[in-house]
């Protein structure tokens, strides 16, 4: 049957509409072009803004800040919500980096594709506003970037201080090369300086079928080279979810620098539109001002006067310089952010005045100070250079420990080296060390609630050291004198002078047996390997000490050695374990909590490492998340004093008093009220 002609267009229209409905939404091509950014609709944060002449300025020269600019709407990179197939995309942009010096800049910038425009957790400096030290490389970042980096950062395995890299979820590039391009005529590689203050054009192309990323760059006046600078297969489907935002990120460090984008184009499933070079705004260029004739006359006279004045001041200056001289070596550049100037520490402690002296530890004196710039209270420990390991390795370990961040750890802020001394800078703890609170007659007796909170806090800090940080940190000297109390009487584990670091999943190395008698696990006498289990043993002794108000090893009235673990175990066998709680509490304690602490302390003190609970279990027991198994006193059938003698610790007791450690006490990093 033939339809009447008037109805034919309507039928055809319905047919095309029906076919159009079958076309997936993901096939819609996204395309935009910005020849300059005047009036451009972009999303900004940080320092990013558009200048009066249309430049997208990501950073304005302010130190240690970041800037981001994004196309405001998310783009669909996967071909459909239930598909992992990726769409191809292409982008072209012109950038420029203007530093204070032609051959030196302050970190770089990056083209980015991100799941979210919110990068508030990212850090400036070497992190370029993309990630931070904790999440660098995490798959949950969902971040793809092409970086233009002007600083060599060894922590990211950078190849040079002038390179281009392809980044996935972090700043350890999956592919990188020195900035430059391949000449189409000769095939020779032409170097480019990212900090030349000249505009550079960049093309980034991704093939959704082959998963190949090509990055090409050239000076603005050079046509696009045929051979890309970088070419890498990258499975972006595992990085980018269905939709993502495209834009730019940059950050500054300690030097003056501005990062600019002059123009930008983007297209999904096709070549990015060519930018109109003649329409792009110009980069600011700093030219030296012509010297005036007046300056030519005045300058020689002023120079002569200045030389005389400088000569008069040199003697005073040199004396002050010698006074505040420090020992610095080239390898310490890596640890720069963790280094304090001796001058600041000198003024902070009033010239290391005796009035500021908190105490004298095993390695040196400890002073209370107030940093002149931040007014923060600190404890400064002056340590003599030891020979137990190379200074470079020692400083590296100090800096590594300085990166620990937990509310129940004393923060190591940094260090300074000078004339045979190493100065360590810590947070100041106003309420002193726990052992002083437990044993000093003039102190008010700690309430049970305070003791239980301190025990749980130190356990939380120990879990962070053992399992939650990037490396395993074995403390090796857990005891009451190494637990400091902040202004709110929260316990913070400190003194990492004996601590050892090793990677998760590896075995600790054999070392000299060091620590404090009464806290040393029995197996250390024959294995020499400090481990998480030996730390748990020391923590068990610590729990008993806090609950009972007695030292792990002491002398009775008849000069007999009394081991706290054995005494508590005897009382448990007699059915009176809570009778061991500190009598100064006069019975004012929660019996269930005290029983838990005492029984858990005994369980941690088991002579077999495998019978002790893991650190996470220990925290779960103390927090009440998991009940402590019902154990009879016969399960702990041992005599700790006999075990210590069997393991050969008696000579060690003679060398290291029971109330001190081979590394000196950390309690001097605090002061009582």
From Swiss-Prot:
ATP binds at residues 358-366, 381. Keywords: ATP-binding, Cell membrane, Glycoprotein, Kinase, Lectin, Membrane, Nucleotide-binding, Receptor, Serine/threonine-protein kinase, Signal, Transferase, Transmembrane, Transmembrane helix. Its main location: membrane. The active site is at residue 477. It is found in: Cell membrane. It comes from the Eukaryota. PROSITE patterns: PROTEIN_KINASE_ATP, PROTEIN_KINASE_DOM, PROTEIN_KINASE_ST. Induction: Induced by salt stress. Residues 318-673 are cytoplasmic. SUPFAM superfamilies: Concanavalin A-like lectins/glucanases, Protein kinase-like (PK-like). Residues 32-270 are annotated as: Legume-lectin like. It catalyses: L-seryl-[protein] + ATP = O-phospho-L-seryl-[protein] + ADP + H(+); L-threonyl-[protein] + ATP = O-phospho-L-threonyl-[protein] + ADP + H(+). Residues 1-27 form the signal peptide. Its EC number is 2.7.11.1. The keyword Transmembrane applies. Mainly expressed in root epidermal cells. It is a single-pass type I membrane protein. One of its GO terms (cellular component) is plasma membrane. SMART domains: S_TKc. Lectin-domain containing receptor kinase involved in salt stress response. Acts as a negative regulator of salt tolerance. In the C-terminal section; belongs to the protein kinase superfamily. Ser/Thr protein kinase family. In the N-terminal section; belongs to the leguminous lectin family. The gain-of-function mutant sit2-D (T-DNA tagging) exhibits reduced tolerance to salt stress. This is L-type lectin-domain containing receptor kinase SIT2. The gene is SIT2.
């Amino acid at each position: 049957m033939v339809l009447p002609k008037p109805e034919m267009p309507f039928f055809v229209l319905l047919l095309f509409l029906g076919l159009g409905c079958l076309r997936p939404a993901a096939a819609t091509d996204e395309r935009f072009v910005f020849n300059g950014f005047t009036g451009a609709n972009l999303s900004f944060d940080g320092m990013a803004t558009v200048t009066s002449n249309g430049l997208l300025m990501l950073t304005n020269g302010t130190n240690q800040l970041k800037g981001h600019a994004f196309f405001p709407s998310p783009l669909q990179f996967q071909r459909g919500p239930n598909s992992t197939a990726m769409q191809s995309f292409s982008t072209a942009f012109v950038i420029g980096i203007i530093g204070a010096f032609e051959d030196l800049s302050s970190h770089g910038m990056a083209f980015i594709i991100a799941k979210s425009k919110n990068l508030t957790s990212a850090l400036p400096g070497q992190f370029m506003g993309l990630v931070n030290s904790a999440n660098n490389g995490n798959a949950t970042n969902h971040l793809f970037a092409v970086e233009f980096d002007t600083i060599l950062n060894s922590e990211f395995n950078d190849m040079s201080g002038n390179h281009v890299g392809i980044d996935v979820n972090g700043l350890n590039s999956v592919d990188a090369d020195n900035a430059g391009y391949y000449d189409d005529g000769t095939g020779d590689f032409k170097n480019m300086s990212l900090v030349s203050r000249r505009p550079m054009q960049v093309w980034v192309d991704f093939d959704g079928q082959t998963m190949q990323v090509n990055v090409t760059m050239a000076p603005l006046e050079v046509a696009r080279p045929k051979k890309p600078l970088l070419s890498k297969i990258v499975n972006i489907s595992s990085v980018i979810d269905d939709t993502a935002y495209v834009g730019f990120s940059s950050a500054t460090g300690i030097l003056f620098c501005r990062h600019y984008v002059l123009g930008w184009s983007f297209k999904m499933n096709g070549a990015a539109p060519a930018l109109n070079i003649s329409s792009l705004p110009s980069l600011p260029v700093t030219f030296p001002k012509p010297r005036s004739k007046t300056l030519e006359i005045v300058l020689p006279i002023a120079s002569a006067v200045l030389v005389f004045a400088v000569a008069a001041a040199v003697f005073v200056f040199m004396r002050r310089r010698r006074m505040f001289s420090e020992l610095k070596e080239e390898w310490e550049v890596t640890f720069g952010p963790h280094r304090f100037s001796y001058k600041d520490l000198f003024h902070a402690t009033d010239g290391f005045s005796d009035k500021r002296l908190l105490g004298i530890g095993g390695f040196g004196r400890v002073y209370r100070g107030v940093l002149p710039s931040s007014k923060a209270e600190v404890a400064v420990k002056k340590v003599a250079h030891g020979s137990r390991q190379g200074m470079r390795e020692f400083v590296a370990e100090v800096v590594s420990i300085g990166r620990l961040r937990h509310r129940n750890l004393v923060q190591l802020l940094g260090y300074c080296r000078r004339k045979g001394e190493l100065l360590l800078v810590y947070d100041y703890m106003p309420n002193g060390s726990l052992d002083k609170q437990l044993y000093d007659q003039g102190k008010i007796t700690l309430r049970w609630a305070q003791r239980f909170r301190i025990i749980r806090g130190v356990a939380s800090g120990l879990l962070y050291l053992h399992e939650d940080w990037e490396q395993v940190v074995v403390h090796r000297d857990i005891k009451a004198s190494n637990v400091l109390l902040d202004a709110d009487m929260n316990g913070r584990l400190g003194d990492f002078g004996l601590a050892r670091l090793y990677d998760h999943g590896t075995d600790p190395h054999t070392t000299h047996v060091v620590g404090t008698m009464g806290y040393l696990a029995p197996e250390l006498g024959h294995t020499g390997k400090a481990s998480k289990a030996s730390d748990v043993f020391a923590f068990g002794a610590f729990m008993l000490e806090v609950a009972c108000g007695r030292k792990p090893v002491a002398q009775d009235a008849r000069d007999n050695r009394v081991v706290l673990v054995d005494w508590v175990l005897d009382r448990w066998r007699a059915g009176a374990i809570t009778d061991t709680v500190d009598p100064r509490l006069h019975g004012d304690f929660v019996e269930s909590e005290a029983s838990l602490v005492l029984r858990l302390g005994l369980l941690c003190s088991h002579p077999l490492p495998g019978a002790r609970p893991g650190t996470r279990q220990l925290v779960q027991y103390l927090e009440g998340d998991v009940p402590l198994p019902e154990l009879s006193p016969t399960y702990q059938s041992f005599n700790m004093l006999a075990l210590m003698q069997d393991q050969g610790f008696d000579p060690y007791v003679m060398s290291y008093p029971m109330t001190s450690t081979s590394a000196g006490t950390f309690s001097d990093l605090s002061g009582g009220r």
